[in-house]
Amino acid sequence: MFDFTGKTALVTGASRGIGRAIAVALAKGGASVALNYAGNEAAAAEALELVQRAGAPRAKLYRFDVADPAACNQAVEDVVADLGGLHVLVNNAGIAVDQLVMRVKDEDWNRQLQVNLTGAFNLTRAVTRPMMKARGGAIVNLTSVVGEMGNAGQAAYAATKAGLIGLTKSVARELASRNVRVNAVAPGYIETDMTAALPEAAKTKLQELIPLARLGTAEDVANAVAFLASDLASYVTGEVLRVNGGMYM
Amino acid sequence: MTTANVEQKVKNIIADQLGVGEDEIKITSSFIEDLGADSLDIVELVMAMEEEFEVEIPDEEAENIKTVQDAVNYITTHKK
């Protein structure tokens, strides 16, 4: 559906869940894909195979911590050299450590901020020069419905996701003159490992809040990301595209 | 490196970054007024010069580098 022929994409947190589905969706469009992952080797190998089978001309795994700025700079350099340029960046890597605010530990707050928000910043800064030089590029940040709504038990996670919206809009303004577009996708409740942990009763209750009356799939989100990353979205920048079944409008 | 060398290299960088012909770049040329640079171009120029000459150009100094001459002066006085 979307044409990424001749393009290279870097997807963070690509070994599982939404990130994996995004990597596959971009590969289906003909993109070469760099898959970042934090440490789950088995899942990463599986994701790589799916991406290759989906039709990526070239695909490669890159294990690094997005919270480490030096590692991000190095990774971007490596991807450009290995896969021929870098045209699409998808900041998807994220962690959630749910706790009521009075019980949030400093290290959990800091780690969520580092991975979810600083990680996206690190890579955005690193890709800016190659994309500006190429006079074009697309960055898609994965935020969340809770970044706009808030959620009890997710003060830190929601704060990082709200922060990503500010990052998205600011960088969209900075880089627009170079035809680098920056957008965000805000998923609602999606069936992934992250939400599988929820008790059944909680899931049923959630579904009542969703007009489309089901949890989303990783593919639902991946399709929205692929659109924003593609040339079909050439006049879209600074946008937050909600993919939530209507639970927040 | 002589001042003439620095000047030539600075001109190369400017030509590359801004996509202008080297013959259009005079020592007195202002990046913004004469060479059509915008704020992003200036940041890119500063970063390219930092890399080429292995000098650090702090933001508050970069603000004062407005012409080719300013850049050459800064580099020749700060280069190790």
UniProtKB/Swiss-Prot annotation, chain B:
Output the Gene3D superfamilies linked to this UniProt entry.
ACP-like (1.10.1200.10)
Presence of keyword Phosphoprotein? yes
Gene Ontology biological process terms in this record: lipid A biosynthetic process
* GO cellular component terms, A-Z: cytosol; membrane
**Which InterPro entries does this one have?**
ACP (IPR003231), ACP-like_sf (IPR036736), PP-bd_ACP (IPR009081), Ppantetheine_attach_site (IPR006162)
Keywords from the named record: Cytoplasm, Fatty acid biosynthesis, Fatty acid metabolism, Lipid biosynthesis, Lipid metabolism, Phosphopantetheine, Phosphoprotein
Q: In which pathway does it act?
A: Lipid metabolism; fatty acid biosynthesis
Compartments reported by the entry: Cytoplasm
**Positions carrying O-(pantetheine 4'-phosphoryl)serine:** 39
Q: Which GO terms describe its molecular function?
A: acyl binding; acyl carrier activity
Name a Pfam family for this protein.
Answer: PP-binding
Q: What is its main location?
A: cytoplasm
The UniProt transmembrane annotation reads: none
Report the superkingdom from the record.
Answer: Bacteria
Modification note: 4'-phosphopantetheine is transferred from CoA to a specific serine of apo-ACP by AcpS. This modification is essential for activity because fatty acids are bound in thioester linkage to the sulfhydryl of the prosthetic group.
Q: Which residues form the Carrier domain?
A: 4-79
Family, similarity comment: Belongs to the acyl carrier protein (ACP) family.
The function of this protein is: Carrier of the growing fatty acid chain in fatty acid biosynthesis.
Protein name, as recorded: Acyl carrier protein
The organism of origin for this protein: Anaeromyxobacter sp. (strain Fw109-5)
